[in-house]
Amino acid sequence: MVVIPLQNIMDDIERLKSEAGIAACDFIRDGMKLGLGTGSTVRYTVIEIGRRISEEGLSVVGVPTSEATRELAEKVGIPLISLAESGGLDLVIDGADEFDNNFSLIKGGGGALTREKIVAQSSKSMVVVADSRKQVDILGEFDLPVEILPFEW
């Protein structure tokens, strides 16, 4: 029997998430208006965008889908605008809670579902970043996020 320390497995998962998040940046072009998604993998995308702005002179603006993403984007130096100011987005990069073989998705388990949907609908294109642990045969294997908006209660 071979025992692999849990820390080694976690390090591998984080490395793969980092690689996936950084690879998503290959779709970004100078001058784009970006939707900045929410989640542990997209976090690496946001950090890489900040690095490219600082080190390579990339010129983009972002619209965050959550307060956590807003805080991180500000920290790494991504200029932010509101969705209303954007006039529409070129690309949104976001994560997924699970996806099936047809690439149908369930999103929003991180608590930013409404904002994620609004930003996605405002974008011309979307890149979804997810690792293989999120792939399922049938959607619904994990918890299903449900929106409840306190409108007219």
Predicted features by range, described:
Residues 2-18, 67-153:
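Conserved phosphate- and dinucleotide-binding cores of soluble alpha/beta proteins
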Residues 49-53:
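Active-site catalytic pocket residues across diverse enzymes, especially alpha/beta-hydrolases
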Residues 31-34, 55-62, 104:
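Short active-site oxyanion
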Residues 38, 62-65:
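Active-site nucleophile and cofactor-binding loops and adjacent substrate-binding regions
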Residues 35-41:
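Glycine-rich beta-strand-to-loop/alpha-helix junction loops that act as flexible
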Residues 24-29, 54:
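Glycine-rich helix-loop-beta junction characteristic of Rossmann-like nucleotide cofactor-binding loops
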